[in-house]
Each structure stands twice: as C-alpha cells, then as structure tokens.
Amino acid sequence: MMSKEKRRVPKLRFPGFTEDWEQRKFSDLYEKISEKNDLSYSLDKIISVANMYYKSDAKVSNEEYLKTYNIFRYGEIAFEGNKSKDFTYGRFVENTIGDGIISHVFEVFRPITKYDIYFWKYYINYEPIMGKVLSRCTKKTTMMTNLVAKDFLKEIVFVPSLAEQKRIGILLNTLDKSITLHHRKLDNLKLKKKALLQKLFPKNGERYPEFRFPGFTDAWEQRKLGDFTNQINTFVNP
C-alpha cells in the first residue's frame, strides 16, 4: 500500500493530498478496554465478530453467563485469533453495526482520537500491513493466536489526515456496497436458473416439460444415451 520511496505516502492518492502519512503508535490511536456486560445487553445483542452481524441463533447456558461477555461498541475493534490462509496471525475486526456484546475471548480496543470508521474498517484488517504487525505481537497456539496487547500498542503504523481517511473510507465502502449488490444479483440469477431448469425439463416419468417455447408441442422422445454417444477407450502403456 505504501510506496518504496522514503516519503511515507501511498502510490495512489486523491487530488489535494500531498503531505506524508504520520507515524503513530497504536497506543496513540487505541486503548485496551474490558467493559463487562451488566445484563444491559441480552441474547439479541450478541455479535458475530467473524461476520459482523447480530446472531439470531445465539445461545448461552444461563443469563448469568452473559455477564462474562465484553461490551463491543460501534467503532471499536476486536482481535480474532483464528488463523487462515488470508490471515496468518489472526485479524482485527471493526464494529460497524452498533453496540452489542461479544465473547470474553475477544480483546477489545477503543479509539481515542478522531478517525474515520470506514477507513479503519479496511486499514486495521489489511493483511499486508497488519500481518507484519501481528507477527510481532501475537503468540501462536495450535489452532489460534493470542494477542499480547501491550506489545500491540507499542507497534507503529502510518496514518493519513482525517480528511484523507474519509476520502479513502468512502471509496472502499462504496466498492463494498457495489460488490454486495452484485452478489445479490448473482444469487437471484442462480435461483431463477434453478427454477427454470425444473420447468424446462420434464419431471421423472413425464414427457412434457411444464414450460415450453411457442411452437413446440410434441412429446419429448424416449432415447437411449447410446444413441447420442460413442464409447472411447483410453489405453495407457505400463
């Protein structure tokens, strides 16, 4: 994302932005918090950190267990230690949906400076930068990585002005919305195709499909597959 030049700037910028990105410690940007749920939040406010939505099917053993949950407020970030091909050391996820609660296994950090929520949604989750940061402030276990919060807060990151954050955040969020819209269109087309297949082909034991194009009225003929195919034998020399 950043150029290889000595100047701390990205290769692509919006017009009007020329100053260097500022070197900051994460401790200048975030503070670690541990705000426990006092039952102000119930089951319907449990957030899936991995997918960032309220879990409609969430279950807990009893109401008292909800007191172990951490409050996760809008704009805060949580560390998810699951390793994957995309995130070698786990990742940070920003809360962009609203206040709620998450399991106590997730460490939560609150922003302490003015920021653009959408810029940080993508920047704090950007593996080429954050992967290097997390490689130095996490400890590996068999399935997950554990964050060492004090080491994370000492790490350095380059940060643009708030105005540039907003421009970048708007662009990336707009692209995300467009991708989501196209995914929905694709899903709808797949459903339509599935429905058409059921109507364009006859059901088992029948010779007429439910839907036909104008001018086609004859029954479909019963034929053996051998009438349409030739067997090809492939020999491999030992």
Where on the chain are the PLM-derived regions?
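Basic chromatin DNA-binding modules
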Residues: 1, 26, 139-142, 156, ...
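Non-catalytic DNA-recognition/assembly elements of restriction-modification systems
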Residues: 13-36, 212-236
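DNA target-recognition patches
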Residues: 27-64, 100, 226-229, 237-238
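A short glycine-rich beta-alpha junction/loop motif
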Residues: 6-10, 100-105, 139-163
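A short beta-sheet element
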Residues: 49, 57, 61, 68-130, ...
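C-terminal accessory/regulatory regions appended to core domains
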Residues: 30, 64, 73-74, 109, ...
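Amphipathic alpha-helical segments with low aromatic content
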Residues: 1-22, 155, 161-221
